[in-house]
């Protein structure tokens, strides 16, 4: 006897299961809404009760996108009592996270078509181009509001600056664009992202414009600016913050010296350089630097010796400040860590569609980090600086 062969249409079955799950989710959510309404009114529908706190007045429909697909919620209308449902609030939070993801995708240069495909794969329904366009407008408004917010941290004694280079499309050609970033430690000892702006290139004009923009928003009380050596930035510091001192990042200084040192000798030279900044006073560091210069010349590393001799003084400015702060103010590490996170995010984009989208994504990431423990955890005890402000070398 021949056996009967049953053929199953896998796609049909998947579709039926998906619809079954979606329907179950919709039914469950609506039942929960009814239970919430009963709890608020302290009575079931049509129930006569002296304990009743409010009355029903029909329903209104609310569409929600869930991981199981689109569902329609029949939200009870109530009279005499406010109905703030926890069900919808939970989905509002989920919707916000979805919105943030869509915004980040768009800012990263993902095409509208690709965003549609991704949303369909994740949530079972496409986000329309009109919705993406609205999210884009909303993103730019929110980020611009944050970027131009007044700085309300009081005084900012320590400011760290750097430039991040990203690739963008300009009239069909690809070029580098600099995004200038500044963070600070405020008078209470907390780190704060001051802002970011497109600088085109790290020249004096870009830095002057950047610093003036920060001052206009409330940057005040700057005692020290830490950053890599950039002549445009140094000239801008002297013009916009004449009372502030400059500290060249020691890590960047080391790298500059290593650029003229054979790989086989980098480790020994690194130990020699670190020994300079391990001294307990500026005078001792200067003496150690002279010794290192002589040793480098003896090792036939004349170019390295010249770089140390010419550049060491601007790496010792931190010695004019409280010793308790030295390890935190002689390098740009506090901003470098942020930059690594930004580069990790922007690397997947490769080339941005324009400079503004690059700036917006950098700002979106900075705003996110600022809202985490990074910005809520005390970074320095500023009482040490307060006690030292009587010293004319700092107070200026």
Where are the regions a protein language model picked out?
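Short, amphipathic alpha-helical "recognition" segments used to contact nucleic acids or chromatin
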Residues: 97-109
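Conserved beta-strand -> loop -> alpha-helix junction used to position metal-binding or nucleic-acid-contacting
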Residues: 224-231, 236-272
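RNase H-like nuclease fold core
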Residues: 74-79, 87-92, 125-126, 131-226, ...
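Acidic/histidine-rich catalytic cores and adjacent linkers
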Residues: 2-4, 35-38, 42, 107, ...
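Metal-dependent DNA phosphodiester-chemistry modules and their immediately adjacent helices/loops
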Residues: 84, 257-291
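Short, conserved DNA-binding cores of transcription-related domains
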Residues: 2-89, 167
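DNA-recognition alpha helix
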Residues: 113-124
């Amino acid at each position: 006897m021949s056996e009967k062969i049953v053929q199953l249409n896998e796609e049909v079955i998947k579709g039926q299961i998906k619809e079954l799950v979606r329907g179950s989710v919709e039914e469950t959510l609506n039942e929960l809404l009814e239970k919430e309404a009963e709890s608020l009114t302290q009575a079931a529908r049509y129930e006569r009760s002296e304990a009743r706190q409010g009355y029903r007045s029909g329903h209104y429909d609310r569409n929600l996108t869930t991981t199981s697909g689109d569902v329609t919620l029949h939200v009870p209308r109530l009279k005499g009592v406010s109905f703030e449902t926890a069900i919808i609030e939970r989905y509002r939070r989920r919707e916000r996270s979805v919105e943030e993801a869509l915004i980040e995708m768009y800012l990263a240069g993902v095409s509208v078509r690709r965003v549609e495909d991704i949303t369909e794969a994740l949530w079972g329904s496409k986000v329309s181009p009109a919705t993406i366009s609205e999210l884009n407008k909303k993103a730019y408004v929110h980020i611009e509001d944050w970027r131009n917010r007044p700085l309300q941290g009081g005084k900012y004694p320590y400011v760290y600056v750097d430039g991040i280079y990203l690739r963008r499309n300009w009239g069909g050609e690809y070029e580098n664009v600099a995004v200038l970033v500044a963070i600070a430690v405020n008078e209470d000892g907390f780190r704060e992202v001051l802002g970011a702006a497109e600088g085109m290139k790290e020249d004096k004009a870009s830095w002057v414009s950047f610093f003036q923009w920060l001052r206009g928003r409330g940057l005040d009380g700057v005692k020290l600016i830490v950053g890599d050596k950039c002549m445009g930035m140094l000239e801008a510091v002297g013009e916009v913050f004449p009372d502030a001192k400059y500290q060249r990042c020691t890590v960047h200084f080391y790298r500059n010296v290593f650029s003229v040192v054979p790989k086989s000798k980098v480790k020994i030279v690194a130990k020699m350089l670190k020994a300079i900044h391990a001294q307990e006073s500026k005078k001792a560091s200067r003496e150690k630097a002279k010794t290192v210069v002589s040793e480098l010349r003896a090792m036939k590393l004349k170019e390295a010796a010249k770089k140390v001799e010419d550049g060491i003084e601007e790496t010792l400015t931190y010695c004019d400040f409280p010793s308790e702060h030295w390890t935190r103010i002689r390098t740009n590490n506090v901003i470098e860590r942020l930059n690594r996170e930004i580069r990790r995010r922007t690397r997947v984009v490769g080339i941005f569609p324009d400079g503004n989208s690059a700036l917006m994504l950098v700002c979106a990431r900075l705003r996110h980090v600022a809202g985490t423990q990074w910005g809520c955890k005390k970074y320095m005890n500023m009482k040490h600086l307060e006690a030292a402000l009587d010293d004319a070398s700092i107070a200026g």
